């Protein structure tokens, strides 16, 4: 993918973030906006994944865990823009009884989400467990995780 195309997607992701947080009058726009380029590059260029065939096991594909779940707006936007669910669902962010809440959750059956995040630091434990499992199963695909600076100073990581 060309750099300009990635820049265009990242710019759209930023617009999505502002719309979601503004529409909900709630959320964490700073961390989300700051990670737009990283997650865009990860999902559109680096990660080996198949949005049309998502399953919780992730066998034979790269896996991503968002540990600092409060930046869910950026992840929801990138997931939608890369084909995991319809982009128009972004308008339901933090609305009652919808899937896209302030922290991603597995009980909402959001394609692309393999871990409920909110307990700071647990993403590292899940990523390590997944990496060991992949290695034991002869699966050479990679595991990625993203953590916030604040969570690195508390919880399981600290």
What are these regions (language model features)?
Residues 1-13:
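N-terminal hydrophobic or amphipathic helices/low-complexity stretches enriched
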Residues 4-5, 26, 148-151:
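Alpha-helix capping and helix-loop boundary segments enriched in small/acidic/polar residues
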Residues 10-26:
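N-terminal capping segment at the start of a domain
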Residues 17-20, 32-158:
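Cofactor-binding active-site loop characterized by glycine-rich and histidine/acidic residues
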């Amino acid at each position: 993918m060309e750099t300009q195309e990635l820049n265009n997607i990242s710019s759209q992701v930023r617009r999505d973030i502002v719309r979601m947080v503004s529409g909900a009058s709630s959320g964490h726009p700073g961390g989300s906006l700051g990670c737009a380029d990283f997650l865009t590059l990860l999902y559109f260029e680096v990660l080996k994944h198949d949005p049309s065939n998502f399953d919780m096991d992730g066998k034979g594909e790269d896996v991503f865990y968002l540990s600092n779940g409060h930046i869910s707006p950026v992840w929801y936007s990138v997931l939608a823009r890369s084909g995991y669910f319809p982009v128009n669902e972004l308008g339901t962010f933090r609305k009652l009884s919808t899937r896209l809440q302030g922290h991603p959750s597995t009980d909402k059956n959001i394609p692309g989400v393999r871990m409920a995040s909110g307990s700071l630091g647990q993403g590292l434990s899940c990523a390590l467990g997944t990496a060991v499992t992949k290695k034991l199963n002869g699966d050479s695909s990679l595991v990625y995780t993203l953590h916030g600076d604040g969570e690195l100073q508390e919880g399981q990581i600290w």
